[in-house]
Amino acid sequence: METLATRLDVCQERLLDLYEKDSNKLEDQIEHWKCIRLECALQYKAREMGYKVLQHQALPALAVSKGKGHKAIELQLALETLQKTVYSTEPWTLQDTCLERWNAPPTGCLKRRGQTVDVIFDGHQDNTMQYVMWGDIYYQNCDGEGWTKVCSNIDAMGIYYMDAEHKVYYVDFKKEASKYGEYGQWEVRMGSSIIFSPASVSSTEEALSISSTGTAEHTRPANSTPRTDNSTKAIPCTPPPRKRARVYSTDQQPHSTSDPVGCDNDRHISDDNNKNQGRHTSSGDTTPIVHFKGEPNTLKCFRQRIQKYKHLFEQASSTWHWACVPGTTKNRGIVTLTYSSVEQRQQFLVTVRIPPSISMSLGVMSL
């Protein structure tokens, strides 16, 4: 016990010295990961022996120490092979060789000089994600010994680096658009240049490619006009219209007259509830409502997201479901919103984007 405590104390003192030194030499970064590796091994052994506290220090769980130790070994070996190359004389800081940087895309590579790239999905400024284009990427060769230094580049398809003659994309805009968007459209902004989604550029438009060094080929500044010939014109990326004209009646399905690509194919509106709009109750004290139906977690997130639109509805219920109804499952919930008028409800539906996984039914409710 005393031997473990003493060795752990010496190891952590050495780590503090390295942090205070804040060196930019590769050998110091290798020493740092050796100390992390030893610290994890000592903590693992102490926990394995049944100790939960060592030197007034709570010991992490066995799985935590083991996982962190494996990562320390991985980084130590990578830096030791880098030390045998010409890149060992370059300045290397703790930040350059930290685990978070190592795990950032592209994973398993050393990276420096990052530049932020903004990607806007579906033309909505509030649906923007940020990615990093690296000025320097160091990746290991196939033999596991040598290293190659490249810079990352960006085009309409994603962010990549060159491995010999092949593009290795570590950010695929199409996959990201399917994850964060609904219409498969995206716009990339970096500095003064804009790169549009391939689906919105004509076949005569030349491919855009920008390197992290600041050089660009066929780039289009944000305030410039696309090049055209006499017969073909480049089509700019136009976001889907925010306003959809919906027509509700007792004998006609709701439809969109301004969305040619069928963006609402997955959204169902019940006609049975729409018929209630024309029904008069004896009390006359009724309010327009919308039932939003979907998976409970999705509905919870949706209810939180619409808080910024409080001026467009009166009240929102918690998630509920029908009881004693055949076919009803607790995996499908309902959130009900009330409105002061039909006009307010229509304004809400025009303004707020409803996720395609949520269906809705319109109606009225007596208060």
Swiss-Prot record:
Main location: host cell
One MF term in the entry's GO annotations: DNA-binding transcription factor activity
Full protein name: Regulatory protein E2
Coiled coil: none
Function: Plays a role in the initiation of viral DNA replication. A dimer of E2 interacts with a dimer of E1 in order to improve specificity of E1 DNA binding activity. Once the complex recognizes and binds DNA at specific sites, the E2 dimer is removed from DNA. E2 also regulates viral transcription through binding to the E2RE response element (5'-ACCNNNNNNGGT-3') present in multiple copies in the regulatory regions of the viral genome. Activates or represses transcription depending on E2RE's position with regards to proximal promoter elements including the TATA-box.
Region entry Transactivation domain, spans: 1-202
UniProt keyword annotations, A-Z: Activator, DNA replication, DNA-binding, Early protein, Host nucleus, Isopeptide bond, Phosphoprotein, Repressor, Transcription, Transcription regulation, Ubl conjugation
InterPro entries found in the cross-reference section: E2/EBNA1_C_sf (IPR035975), Nucleotide-bd_a/b_plait_sf (IPR012677), Papillomavirus_E2_C (IPR000427), PPV_E2_N (IPR001866), Reg_prot_E2 (IPR033668), Regulatory_protein_E2_N (IPR036050), Regulatory_protein_E2_N_1 (IPR042503), Regulatory_protein_E2_N_2 (IPR042504)
HAMAP family: PPV_E2
Chain's gene name: E2
Residue stretches of biased makeup (Polar residues): 207-233, 249-259, 275-286
PTM comment text: Phosphorylated.
